[in-house]
């Protein structure tokens, strides 16, 4: 959808709906509907417009649980001063309450879904002041802390890396094995780095001395390099920190999976503008990479990039226009970017002044004014140089004159 079509609002609504289950968990917080979300309606009274927010604001959701049980729930904000209701979310809350009881009993068969929302401000963010180590209270629901804040909370993640790295060194001193959950998270990050850089020998570790994540790799000259992740470009940082945040949350939520935690944990991840900071070559593969690194996760993303849209099938695409969800009008997978721009995003791939000359050419052809058509086409050829569409227009003009 275009700017203002409602992509971010849709993702935030899904986040509010999903976070409802957190009301049943110790230490996790549900999101609420903001009064600013109310639709504004203007009434003409006298010489002025009287603008009034429209209530109630309601979010309705339907989900499939464990591939078989379908549930439905609603959250509502009835007035500007009211609170977001949970009374119509009984089905979801019963499931969450059952999860909480199983957590209290130490049930290792319980698989907690990873749930997170990443907004456009997700770049390697140190926005929260977390001076105390929340992992002192070692509970699996720590994996939900700040998961709906819209950013990868680097302070929380670094606390976890420090704790697990210390445990790794203690294991080594005592003759024990590695920490499989930590290695699984590093492996996910290494896969991500290798895929977007073309490297095949990257190694990611937590540096206790600098309290940074370091990445080691072999450069173009065969020299082994080691630099802090924080010194990489925005594109690398945003993508790798996203993968790291998802992976470490999985490890906290489901430590019983050990080294297979990223492969076995399911869940839903929301990403606003998944193409943010990414080179077009990365945009083409970002969804494929994410779904291969986390094969049991459902990703719901928004994008303006045709390179992202043509990397997925038509049935996986929703087009938003005027707050309405529409199916893609054509197959998207493998289509060229210009075709996606025209048919899906309703964007002209050429500047308006150039498009006007194209229109003038075809208008001249319709009027059989071939001299005018030739003049317009020659001007376009001078401006654009070698262009397949211009070559086709030249052939058409020659055929018309036979």
Q: Locations of the language-model features?
A:
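Extended helical coiled-coil dimerization/tether regions that scaffold
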Residues: 64, 143-264
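A short, compositionally biased
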Residues: 51-60, 208-212, 312-314
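Short coil/turn segments at secondary-structure boundaries
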Residues: 130-131, 206, 353-357
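P-loop NTPase switch/coupling surface
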Residues: 1-157, 194, 198, 385-402
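Non-catalytic, well-ordered alpha-helical scaffold segments
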Residues: 8, 112-115, 142, 237-240, ...
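Acidic, Mg2+-coordinating catalytic modules of nucleic-acid enzymes
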Residues: 109, 284, 325, 329-402
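Switch/communication elements of ASCE P-loop NTPase nucleotide-binding domains
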Residues: 1-30, 212-349
